[in-house]
From Swiss-Prot:
Reported function: Usually encoded in the trnK tRNA gene intron. Probably assists in splicing its own and other chloroplast group II introns.
HAMAP family found in the cross-reference section: MatK (MF_01390)
Main subcellular location: plastid
GO annotations of cellular component type: chloroplast
Protein name, as recorded: Maturase K
GO MF annotation list: RNA binding
The organism of origin for this protein: Spiraea cantoniensis
Protein keywords: Chloroplast, mRNA processing, Plastid, RNA-binding, tRNA processing
Places the protein is found: Plastid, Chloroplast
Length: 502
């Protein structure tokens, strides 16, 4: 972001907290479609001149201000859907460009909070991966006893999102334009605003930014109290959260003695907090009484500070040893790992049973088969079938599509402690690919496998399997058992549609 700061001309705008003029900048909308911010060629080949695009943007914004949002019929909602990705394209482009502009204050603060050392940058990049959470769970969860899976509530009114964002973006004009976007979308379906699977196709960049700012608002307070009350300070969260006007938002001043009492009341050095998608996990080594205190504290924080409604009865507290947690596409549970140690002292020998808890991560085979059945790779029982819609493609395209899906699933579930379910999913995809090719060539599966079986199956090998076969062509049982262990990758930043069963 630092290299684009001069290009954005942010010094003048940031000095007065005025971002609204950036809406009329041509390169903003080019960057909105270039999500990586890396390809400078796109900035030069936009396709239309600055004057025409500036007039279009001015007209659309004026039309938005002139609309009467109180009188909208059902027919108008179908014909003039504001955020439809196939209808009213220019309005969607404005909303995408607006999302890029609102992200600027967040990006500048995150860049300034990072240290200039290369190790810190690499560490922060690795923490973006979804798999970075699992080594943390492997390290911490065996020492904990209770876990609570919490569904993060969303605000009941759109103005709460605007007020939350007001502490980051102090530009009234931009906030007024944001209100127009939100109220226009609210007339169609407010529930789909927070549900990722429903609004992800409309404008995910804007609404994910709003949702993350809403969650970050209450987490900044929650983690502030957590750090103050713990003997083990969580310094790693400093680059992700900021305490935004914490004491200014409290209507009445709080006495220092009372604050210390509250912090002592929640003191627990073994409390851990993890957030993923729209849920969060609270895990502790202490008794269920302390977990209940944290549960009601969270509910009061949501209701009194963030003005969102949450029911304490929906937050369940479970024992890790008896409860399986569905977490980012894995079924995670604590499995006792028994080991027998024989020790001998002079003439006496002793046999001791040593039981250690270990995090067990399993592939959810039934939800995965349901997902494969929906996209016609298999039937409801998990038997592979041909993909009829791909039969008209070339052989290379058919194999390439199946191989990419198979490798993505293998890559994501490489951390599974038991590979049997993963092998079954790969078998379904391989046989579905063979049946699709056999259907295209009007042949049987057996005949097709006799001709191209060995070469075809080699395409489905992952990179790890190929390297292992080259290094250890005749690996022993011990080596095969070793390489069947869990592997976590730090280059996974999103969940595949087949993996996401939420």
């Amino acid at each position: 972001m630092e290299e684009y700061q001069g290009y954005f001309e942010l010094d003048g705008y940031q000095q007065h907290d005025f971002l609204y003029p950036l809406i009329f900048r041509e390169y903003i909308y080019a960057l909105a479609h270039d999500h990586g911010l890396n390809r400078s060629v796109l900035l030069d080949n936009v396709g239309y001149d600055n004057k025409s695009s500036l007039l279009i943007i001015k007209r659309l914004i004026s039309r938005m201000y002139q609309q009467n949002h109180l009188i909208i019929s059902a027919n108008d909602s179908n014909q003039n859907k504001f955020f439809g990705y196939n209808k009213n394209l220019y309005s969607q482009i404005i909303s995408e460009g607006f999302a890029v502009i609102v992200e600027i204050p967040f990006s500048l603060r995150s860049v300034s909070s990072l240290e200039t050392t290369e190790t810190e940058i690499v560490k922060s990049y690795n923490l973006r991966s979804l798999h970075s959470l699992f080594p943390f769970l492997e390290d911490k969860f065996p020492h904990l006893n209770y876990v609570s899976d919490v569904l993060i509530p969303y605000p009941i009114h759109l103005e709460i999102l605007v007020q939350t964002l007001r502490y980051w973006v102090k530009d009234p004009s931009s906030l007024h334009l944001l209100r127009l976007f939100l109220h226009e979308y609210y007339n169609y379906n407010w529930n789909s605003l927070i549900t990722p699977n429903k609004f992800i196709k409309s404008n995910p960049r804007l609404f994910l930014l709003l949702y993350n700012s809403h969650v970050c608002e209450y987490e900044s307070i929650f983690l502030f109290l957590r750090n103050q009350s713990s003997h083990l300070r969580l310094t790693s969260y400093g680059i992700f959260f900021e305490q935004i006007h914490f004491y200014e938002k409290i209507k009445y001043p709080v006495e220092n003695d009372f604050t210390v009492a509250i912090l002592w009341f929640f003191k627990d050095p073994f409390m851990h907090y993890v957030r993923y998608q729209g849920k969060s996990i609270l895990a502790s080594k202490d008794t269920p009484l302390l977990m209940n205190k944290w549960k009601y504290y969270l509910v009061n924080l949501w209701q009194c500070h963030s003005y969102v409604w949450s029911q304490p009865g929906r937050i369940y507290i479970n024992q890790l040893s008896k409860h399986s947690l569905y977490f980012l596409g894995y079924f995670s549970s604590m499995r006792p790992n028994l080991s027998v140690v024989r020790s001998q002292m002079l003439e006496n020998s002793f046999i001791m049973d040593n039981a250690m808890k270990k995090l067990d991560t399993l592939v959810p085979i039934i939800p995965l088969i349901v997902s494969l059945a929906k996209v016609k790779f298999c039937n409801a029982l998990g038997h592979p079938i041909s993909k009829s819609t791909w039969a008209d493609s070339s052989d290379f395209d058919i194999i390439d599509r199946f191989v990419r899906i198979c490798r993505n699933i293998s890559h994501y579930y490489s951390g599974s402690s038991r590979k049997k379910s993963l092998y079954r999913i790969k078998y379904i995809l391989r046989l579905s690919c063979v049946k699709t090719l056999a259907r295209k060539h009007k042949s049987t599966v057996r005949t097709f496998l006799k001709r191209f079986g060995s070469k075809l199956l080699e395409e489905f090998f992952t990179e790890e399997e190929q390297i292992r076969s080259l290094i250890f062509p005749r690996a022993s049982y011990t080596l095969n058992k070793f390489y069947r262990g869990r592997i976590w990758y730090f280059d996974i930043f999103y969940i595949n549609d087949l993996v996401n069963h939420e």
